[in-house]
């Protein structure tokens, strides 16, 4: 009763795992595919650029991107997204239109 047992995980417990780099690449593709359904490409590019600029390695940038986009998608869906993104095209100004400061 007073003896302390060391707990050890058996070596053959569970299926073999894929290498971390492969898991990271697969997860990146999955999260990007899902994110494209809900957010404009300009947002995804900005998040990606932020991750690259604020981490020390490509692996860390991928991890950060996955974390941020996972949270963003979760919040987006929790707020009632119907599951599709419809990108709006920017409206072009009427032909012959010139901005006010552009008088020649």
From Swiss-Prot:
GO terms for biological process: symbiont entry into host cell; viral penetration into host nucleus. Residues 1-21, 85-104 are annotated as: Disordered. Keywords: Activator, AIDS, Cell cycle, Host nucleus, Host-virus interaction, Transcription, Transcription regulation, Viral penetration into host nucleus, Virion, Virus entry into host cell. The keyword Hydrolase does not apply. It is found in: Virion; Host nucleus. Pfam families: VPR (PF00522). It comes from the Viruses. Transmembrane segments: none annotated. One of its GO terms (cellular component) is virion component. Interacts with human UNG. This is an African mandrill isolate. Stimulates gene expression driven by the HIV-2 LTR. Prevents infected cells from undergoing mitosis and proliferating, by inducing arrest or delay in the G2 phase of the cell cycle. Cell cycle arrest creates a favorable environment for maximizing viral expression and production. This is Protein Vpr. It comes from Simian immunodeficiency virus (isolate GB1). The gene is vpr.
């Amino acid at each position: 009763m007073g003896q302390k047992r060391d707990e050890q995980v058996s070596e053959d417990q569970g299926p073999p795992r894929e290498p971390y780099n492969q898991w990271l690449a697969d997860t990146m593709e999955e999260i990007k595919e899902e994110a494209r359904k809900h957010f404009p490409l300009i947002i995804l590019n900005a998040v990606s650029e932020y991750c690259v600029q604020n981490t020390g390695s490509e692996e860390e940038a991928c991890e950060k991107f996955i974390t941020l986009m996972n949270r963003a998608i979760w919040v987006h869906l929790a707020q009632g997204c119907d599951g599709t993104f419809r990108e709006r095209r920017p409206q072009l100004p009427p032909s012959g239109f010139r901005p006010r400061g552009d008088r020649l």
